[in-house]
């Protein structure tokens, strides 16, 4: 029988890696708590229609990368390729943004895309999403940008990333610009790449996002979106840039930045880095004021961003910003198998009294000699011996594993006070 292996592009997170994830997740939660964002937990499986109507049928994600299947009732379902669509569906279904209500939410979890696996980009990947609903003014734009900047700053990597941003203007601005772009592209139809040709009919703006070199040459003299943006949108964008200047954020206006998802409008942005080889985005977001209404909800402002956590961990690791793994025990208990119940109850009492103490033991309960060998390998500070002789004397033995000190006995009624000093 062949050996079962993990699916290509999926990863197990082993114990020595989990501590890095826990460090990152605790930092994220701490920062978002300061801004009063509430965590939500969303299903990984949604109706396929949700992503067709939000992300866009012509987007690479929906047309090439989703994991779709038909369930036993004949309904088409999709493993979520991103989090915003599901979060908006939840907001609509639970009437969280009706009648002027506001929500500030965040979530974290696995997303799924069928793309070529490479370092920092996998078919199952973890993503942080931060979303705000019901806010129309510029203040929420500035808060979202500040939160994303503070995440990098708190992690010690703000010097490793640069913010790129653009404004897509209003819906009417984009319609006017789309007409001008299509008119410009007419003579160059044959020179466009296959994906861009498909986008001509459904979402021409996405052509600006093409990675094809020949298409980018065609676009070199194309009309600029900034020339079609109304005065209010332009003023708002200029005020955003002025705020970033005052905050001291390293940023650059990128007029070709339109984002890879169809639902964006107004402000769009990416945080990029060159520390992982070719320039790569580690965070991306923007406004999507029409998405709630397009999915059947009441019209409400919306803005958010997402961070790929694997890529962020790679960046932290490359810059030496992850904590050194510390899986050492404080105390290794060595137990007499003949006094098992009493010994285990004693150890459990220590755990209850000193929850910060990291305790280990050999649950195979081999000989004292084999238990001492495991205690030495554990790198614990001390070994506490609970043997028959010790218990008769209402005491435990203490052997110092990291210090050149004589073994000693500690009375049972003083054990907690003694171990409390070990935990400090």
UniProtKB/Swiss-Prot annotation:
| Paired cysteines (S-S) | none
Entry's Gene3D superfamilies? Answer: Anticodon-binding domain, Bira Bifunctional Protein, Domain 2
Example GO molecular function term? histidine-tRNA ligase activity
For whether the record's keyword set contains Nucleotide-binding, the answer is yes
Name the Enzyme Commission number(s) assigned to this protein: 6.1.1.21
Is Cytoplasm one of the keywords?
yes
Query: What is a single Pfam family found in this protein's UniProt entry?
Result: tRNA-synt_His
Reactions this protein catalyses: tRNA(His) + L-histidine + ATP = L-histidyl-tRNA(His) + AMP + diphosphate + H(+)
GO CC term (a single one): cytoplasm
Task: For this entry, list what GO says about its biological process.
Answer: histidyl-tRNA aminoacylation
Which InterPro entries has this protein been placed in? Answer: aa-tRNA-synth_II, aa-tRNA-synth_II/BPL/LPL, Anticodon-bd, Anticodon-bd_dom_sf, His-tRNA-ligase, HisRS-like_core, HisRS/HisZ
The domain of life for this entry's organism is Bacteria
Cell compartment(s), UniProt: Cytoplasm
- Record keywords, A-Z: Aminoacyl-tRNA synthetase, ATP-binding, Cytoplasm, Ligase, Nucleotide-binding, Protein biosynthesis
Matching entries from HAMAP family are given as:
His_tRNA_synth
Which protein family is named in the record?
A: Belongs to the class-II aminoacyl-tRNA synthetase family.
Q: How the protein assembles, per its UniProt entry?
A: Homodimer.
- What protein is this chain from? Histidine--tRNA ligase
Q: Where does this protein come from, organism-wise?
A: Francisella philomiragia subsp. philomiragia (strain ATCC 25017 / CCUG 19701 / FSC 153 / O#319-036)
Taxon lineage: Bacteria, Pseudomonadati, Pseudomonadota, Gammaproteobacteria, Thiotrichales
Gene symbol here is hisS
């Amino acid at each position: 029988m062949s050996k079962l292996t993990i699916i290509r592009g999926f990863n197990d997170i082993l114990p020595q890696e989990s501590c890095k994830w826990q460090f990152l997740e605790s930092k994220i939660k701490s920062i978002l708590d300061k801004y009063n964002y509430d965590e939500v937990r969303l299903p990984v499986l949604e109706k396929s229609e949700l992503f067709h109507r939000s992300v866009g049928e012509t987007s690479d994600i929906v047309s090439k990368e989703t994991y779709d299947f038909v369930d036993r009732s004949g309904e088409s379902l999709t493993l979520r390729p991103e989090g915003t669509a599901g979060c908006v569906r939840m907001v609509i279904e639970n009437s969280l943004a009706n009648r002027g209500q506001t929500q500030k939410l965040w979530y974290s979890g696995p997303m799924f895309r069928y793309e070529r696996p490479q370092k920092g980009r996998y078919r199952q990947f973890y993503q942080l999403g931060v979303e705000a609903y019901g806010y129309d003014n510029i203040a929420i734009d500035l808060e979202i940008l500040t939160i994303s900047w503070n995440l990098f700053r708190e992690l010690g990597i703000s010097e490793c990333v640069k913010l790129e941003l653009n404004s897509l203007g209003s819906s009417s601005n984009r319609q006017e610009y789309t007409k001008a772009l299509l008119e410009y592209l007419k003579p160059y139809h044959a020179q466009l790449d296959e994906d861009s040709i498909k986008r001509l009919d459904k979402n021409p703006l996405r052509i600006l996002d093409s990675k094809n070199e020949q298409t980018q040459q065609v676009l070199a003299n194309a009309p600029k979106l900034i020339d079609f943006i109304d005065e209010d949108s332009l003023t708002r964008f200029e005020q955003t840039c002025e705020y970033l200047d005052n905050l001291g954020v390293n940023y650059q206006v990128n007029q070709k930045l339109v984002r890879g998802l169809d639902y964006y409008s107004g402000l769009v942005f990416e945080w990029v880095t060159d520390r992982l080889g070719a320039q790569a985005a580690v965070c991306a977001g923007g406004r999507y004021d029409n998405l709630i209404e397009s999915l059947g909800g009441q019209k409400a402002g919306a803005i958010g961003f997402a961070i790929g956590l694997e890529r962020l961990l790679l960046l932290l690791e490359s810059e030496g910003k992850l904590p050194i793994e510390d899986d050492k025990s404080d105390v290794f208990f060595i137990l007499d198998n003949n006094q098992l119940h009493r010994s285990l109850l004693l150890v459990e009492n220590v755990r209850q009294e000193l929850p910060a103490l990291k305790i280990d033991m050999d649950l195979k309960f081999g000989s004292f000699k084999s238990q001492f060998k495991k205690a030495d390998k554990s790198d614990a500070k001390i070994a506490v011996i609970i043997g028959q002789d010790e218990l008769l004397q209402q005491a435990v033995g203490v052997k110092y594993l990291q210090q050149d000190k004589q073994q000693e006995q500690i009375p049972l009624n003083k054990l907690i006070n003694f171990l409390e000093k070990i935990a400090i």
